[in-house]
């Protein structure tokens, strides 16, 4: 054996002892025209003659070729090798401790994120309920103000004829005063004009009869028009209230909470301005209406006075002086009635001004309450923004910890491969030199670490095949192999409403081979974004539209197909996943070295990387 080793050293092609291990990676993708594989496979092949263990083999060969002195130095070489492996084991143990610490830290951060997310959901729900209550109260207050405004409009319309009559009565009073003076002068010529007055009286009788009939019909029409106007006003107010309520309800269902508050505030200001403007116009027009009503009343009284005057001319011409005196008395009574009408007008005006002032105070109070609510909304929005920033920082920290953990995990994988190679090389050399390997110290830590470095005699190779198709913009981008989630992706530049759509999963997983899920009616997938539907057994927080937690579970098998259908039952997307497993019992080669180390890396789109050495 010594001669053989010396020959190898003295040959023309000595072995290269300073080269590092090399690896080759291959990736395989199997899919249809619209599908892509979500799992990548990386194979790492370790070559024995190019490992750092070559240095150890060269040192052992040099000792053997030196004759008896080389044989005497073999225990020292083995001792050095043992010390080197102890050093490697200690380093690897430190890596394992670091990974465990990182895992514990990640678990703590995940619990913190779940706590913050649950608190945020509860607080958002409370804020939403509080806002809904305030909006309902404001809507009821607005309905009450609208009803009061309708009542004021009806009262204004009812007082308008009285005001017109008062104005007409005032003008007629002036006319009657002038006619009274003319009548005193005309009494002297009454006898000469008696015949003409009698003829005119007959004409006046006919004209008065026609005017009386026309006046009755006009009064009936006015009453009917007043009733119709009152009904139309009530219907218009109710229709406006219903229309406003429907608009607010639609705005609330759209979920645009901040825009709704701004719109509501602007609407309140506009309504306040309109109410003030309408009340000012009503106040100006109410006086005109009351004067018109007064004028109509005076005109009716004037007609009655003219009838009395003509009858007096016909019946008692000789008592014309007494009739003139009676006209004076009636004029005084009309003056008294006019004064009373003016007092009533002033009282109505005062009452209207008082009502207008009360409405203005009520509007100011509502505006102050609305401003207070705006301040509260701003405070809550600021608090929500702070919470979201804190949650974002926590997510960033968690991502950083996961990246650090992944780096440590990659180093651990390479160290596992190197340690396995070193162990196999050492065992081969010890068998070739007929050397007995000394036992390792039987401590709990060494036993535990030894189990992690043990290379299995066999392994199972799992292969996944995915096929996907879609007829629209929504695609089924991923199916989790463990049945934790199904991901939908919107590949268009516009938002797509998927409310009422249905997901159906069919697998060969025993009797319960079907799982269906109906999407909520308000669900929308934003442009170039995705929505993930999680099983109920995961620890994911329900945060639509990005993450939705269903009540059931996804049941996957060796062959699983998922279809997405619209509310009408039209299939728009499909994805099928097939997994196959093969077992290889010849993991170690004839020399005791591993044939290859396989690294299976899951797709990074789900923010989880599962690395397995087989």
Curated annotation (Swiss-Prot):
Residues 81-433 form the IF rod domain. Residues 612-614 form a propeptide. Residues 129-268 are annotated as: Coil 1B. Residues 287-426 are annotated as: Coil 2. Residues 1-76 are annotated as: Head. It is found in: Nucleus inner membrane. PROSITE patterns: IF_ROD_2 (PS51842), LTD (PS51841). Residues 77-117 are annotated as: Coil 1A. One of its GO terms (biological process) is nuclear envelope organization. Residues 1-10 have a biased composition (Basic residues). Residues 118-128 are annotated as: Linker 1. Intermediate filament (IF) protein, component of the nuclear lamina, a fibrous layer on the nucleoplasmic side of the inner nuclear membrane, which is thought to provide a framework for the nuclear envelope. Contains an alpha-helical IF rod domain organization with three coiled coil-forming segments (coil 1A, coil 1B, and coil 2). This is Lamin-2.
């Amino acid at each position: 054996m010594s001669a053989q080793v010396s020959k190898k050293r003295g040959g023309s092609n000595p072995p290269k002892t300073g080269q590092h291990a090399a690896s080759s990676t291959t990736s395989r993708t199997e899919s249809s025209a619209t599908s892509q594989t979500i799992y990548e496979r990386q194979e790492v092949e370790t070559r024995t003659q190019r490992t750092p263990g070559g240095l150890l083999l060269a040192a052992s060969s040099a000792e053997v070729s030196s004759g008896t002195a080389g044989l005497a130095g073999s225990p020292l070489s083995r001792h050095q090798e043992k010390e080197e492996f102890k050093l490697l084991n200690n380093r690897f143990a430190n890596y394992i401790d670091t990974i465990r610490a990182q895992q514990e830290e990640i678990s703590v951060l995940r619990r913190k994120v779940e706590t913050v997310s649950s608190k945020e959901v509860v607080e958002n729900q409370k804020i939403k309920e509080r806002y809904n209550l305030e909006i309902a109260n404001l809507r009821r207050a607005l309905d009450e103000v609208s009803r009061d405004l309708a009542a004021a409009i009806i009262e204004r319309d009812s007082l308008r004829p009285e005001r017109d009559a008062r104005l007409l009565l005032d003008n007629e009073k002036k006319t009657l005063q002038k006619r009274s003076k003319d009548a005193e002068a005309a009494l002297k010529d009454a006898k000469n004009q008696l015949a003409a007055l009698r003829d005119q009286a007959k004409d006046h009788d006919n004209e008065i009869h026609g005017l009386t009939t026309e006046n009755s019909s006009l009064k009936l029409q006015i009453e009917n028009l007043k009733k119709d106007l009152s009904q139309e006003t009530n219907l218009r107010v109710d229709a406006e209230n219903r229309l406003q309520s429907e608009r607010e309800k639609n705005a609330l269902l759209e979920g645009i909470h901040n825009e709704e508050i701004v719109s509501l505030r602007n609407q309140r200001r506009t309504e306040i301005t309109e109410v003030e403007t309408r009340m000012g116009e009503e106040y100006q027009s109410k006086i005109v209406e009351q004067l018109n009503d007064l004028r109509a009343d005076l005109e009716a009284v004037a007609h009655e006075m003219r009838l009395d005057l003509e009858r007096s001319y016909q019946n008692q011409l000789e008592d014309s002086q007494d009739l003139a005196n009676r006209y004076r008395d009636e004029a005084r009574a009309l003056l008294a009635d006019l004064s009373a009408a003016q007092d009533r007008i002033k009282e109505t005006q005062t009452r209207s001004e008082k009502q207008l002032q009360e409405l203005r105070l009520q509007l100011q109070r509502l505006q102050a309450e609305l401003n207070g609510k705006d301040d509260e909304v701003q405070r809550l929005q600021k608090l929500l923004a702070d919470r979201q920033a804190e949650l974002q920082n926590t997510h960033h920290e968690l991502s950083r910890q996961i990246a650090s953990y992944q780096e440590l995990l990659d180093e651990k994988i390479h160290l596992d491969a190197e340690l396995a190679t070193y162990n196999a090389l050492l065992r081969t050399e010890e068998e070739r030199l007929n050397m007995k390997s000394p036992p390792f110290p039987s401590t709990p830590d060494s036993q535990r670490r030894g189990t992690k470095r043990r290379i299995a005699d066999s392994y199972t190779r799992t292969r996944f095949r995915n096929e996907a198709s879609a007829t629209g913009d929504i695609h089924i981008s991923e199916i989790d192999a463990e049945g934790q989630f199904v991901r939908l992706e919107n590949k268009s530049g516009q938002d797509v409403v998927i409310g009422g759509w249905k997901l159906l999963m069919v697998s060969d997983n025993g009797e319960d081979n079907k799982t269906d899920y109906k999407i909520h009616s308000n669900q929308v997938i934003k442009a170039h974004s995705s929505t993930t539907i999680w099983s109920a057994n995961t620890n994911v927080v329900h945060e639509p539209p990005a993450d939705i937690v269903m009540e059931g579970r996804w049941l996957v098998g060796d062959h699983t197909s998922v279809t997405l259908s619209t509310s009408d039952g039209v299939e728009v997307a499909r994805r099928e996943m097939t997994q196959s497993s093969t077992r290889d019992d010849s993991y170690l080669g004839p020399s005791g070295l591993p044939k290859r180390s396989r690294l299976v890396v899951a797709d990074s789109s789900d923010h989880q990387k599962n690395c397995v050495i087989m």
